[in-house]
Amino acid sequence: MAKELIFGKDARTRLLQGINKIANAVKVTVGPKGQNVILERKFANPLITNDGVTIAKEIELSDPVENIGAKVISVAAVSTNDIAGDGTTTATILAQEMTNRGIEIINKGANPVNIRRGIEDASLLIIKELEKYSKKINTNEEIEQVAAISSGSKEIGKLIAQAMALVGKNGVITTDDAKTINTTLETTEGIEFKGTYASPYMVSDQEKMEVVLEQPKILVSSLKINTIKEILPLLEGSVENGNPLLIVAPDFAEEVVTTLAVNKLRGTINVVAVKCNEYGERQKAALEDLAISSGTLAYNNEINSGFKDVTVDNLGDARKVQIAKEKTTVIGGKGNKDKIKKHVELLNGRLKQTTDKYDSDLIKERIAYLSQGVAVIRVGGATELAQKELKLRIEDALNSTKAAVEEGIIAGGGVGLLNASCVLTNSKLKERYENETSVENIKEILLGFEIVQKSLEAPARQIIQNSGVDPVKILSELKNEKTGVGFDAETKKKVDMIANGIIDPTKVTKTALEKAASVASSLITTNVAVYDVKERKDNSFSE
C-alpha cells in the first residue's frame, strides 16, 4: 500500500488534534462528579463507562494522522493500566497537557531534545517526591477508603475490604457475573500463578485479551511438551468428553502451539495451552499446587513417551479458569479436600524447618492460596449495560486497592501532584547541568521542567471543573494551603484530603506520570508522520 508523509509543524498539529480529541473524551470522567461516556461497539451492545483505558481503546478517528496521535496517547493509558491497574484517566490528562505545552514551545523554535530531557528529568524528581509523601495503609478502614474512592461507591469499598480480610492483602480476588441484580462476595478454592496463553489466537475476549474456560479439564505437565503426538490421545478424549481443556506446562514446542491454536480457531476443540512463567522452585511449586488443588498430578512426560497411561479421567477439574496476559487464576478446583489438607500440613512442616527468607515467603504464599482460596465478587445489575459498567468499576477499584497496599497512598484529587510540583521551583536546578552543557541548552531543559510543573495542575483542575466550579480561583488558593489540603468535589470545600479519606494510591500516580512523560517526550520529538494512502476505487464504466 502507498504511503503519505507529512512533516514538521503540519505533522505535529494534526497529531495534536487526534490527541486532544481522545483526551477530551476521557477527561470528562475524572473525579466523583465525572460523567460517563457511551461507546458504540460493532459486534456488541453499547457500553456506558467512565474507565479511561476502555474509552481510549474504542476510539478510532477517520483522519489517519489524527488517529496516529490518538493511538499514541492511548499507550499512556494502556501501559498505566497494565502496570498499576488504574490511573488511566490521570495518565491521559497529563500526557495531553505535556504534549500541548511541549509542541507549543517546539513550534517556536526550541530544541526538542533539550525539552525532552527536561520533561524526563523533572518527572523523575516528582516521582521521588511522591515517594516521600507516601503513607502506608494497614487497617481495613483505610483499605475501604481507597476502594470507595476508586469505585465511587462506599458499598463497593466495603465489599473489597471484606474480600481482602477473607483472603489476605496479597490474596486472589476476582470478579464474575451474578445471575441476580445483587452484588455479593463469596470465597472458593482456587490458586493463581504467573502464566499466560501460549498464543494470542487462543484468546476468547479480544477486548480484555483474556480467556475464560468454564468447567475445564486440566492437564499439568512438569516438562516441556515437544510434540502434538504426546498429547493426541488426550485431545481426542477431550473432544469426546465435551469439556474445555487447559494444558499447563513450563513450555511448548512451536508445532504444538500452532496445532492447538488452529484446531481451536476451527472449533474442533476448545483448548488453551498455558505457559507457566514461574522459574526454578517457584515453577515446581506452582505446578504441584495446581495439580493437587484441581485433583490431578504434575505429570513428568519423558520425550517421545507421551502421556501413555493418562486418560481424560485422570485430569484435574475446576469450576472456572481465567487466563490473562500475565497470570492465570483457577477458581473452584475440585481436588480431594483431605489430600489438600495433608499437603498444607506438609508445607507447614517445611515452614517450621526452613531458615531461608525466600523459601519461607514462598511456602507462606502457597499455604495462603491452598487454605484461604479465592474471593469472588459476583457482580449484579438490572441490565447487561449496568452490570458491565459496575464490573469495570469494581475491577479498577480492586487494582487501585492492591496498588495502595503495595506502595501506600498520597493525597487524592490531584493534590499529591500539586504538592510534589514544588520541588521543580528549586533555584539550584541549574547547577545539575552547568558542567555538561551550554547556557542556551540549560534554558531549554528548564523549559521542560516548567512544562511538567504546569502540567501537574491539570488533574486537579479537571476534577474541580467536572464538579461545576471554576478551577482558576480554587487552584490559586490551594497553592497557598499547607501540604495535603485540597478541594473536595463532593462538598465543594477545601479539606485535608487524607484525613477525609480522599486519597490516591502512590503507585498509580507514579505510573501515570511516568507513562505520560514517556508518551509526551516521544511526541514532541516527532518530525514526520507516515500513514497509508487508501486506494481509490475506479468506478468508471469500461466497455
Swiss-Prot record:
Signal peptide segment: none
Phenotype of the disrupted gene, per the record: Probably essential, it was not disrupted in a global transposon mutagenesis study.
Localization terms from the record: Cytoplasm
SUPFAM superfamilies for the chain: GroEL apical domain-like, GroEL equatorial domain-like, GroEL-intermediate domain like
Reactions catalysed according to its record: ATP + H2O + a folded polypeptide = ADP + phosphate + an unfolded polypeptide
Biological function: Together with its co-chaperonin GroES, plays an essential role in assisting protein folding. The GroEL-GroES system forms a nano-cage that allows encapsulation of the non-native substrate proteins and provides a physical environment optimized to promote and accelerate protein folding.
Protein name, as recorded: Chaperonin GroEL
Species, as recorded: Mycoplasma genitalium (strain ATCC 33530 / DSM 19775 / NCTC 10195 / G37) (Mycoplasmoides genitalium)
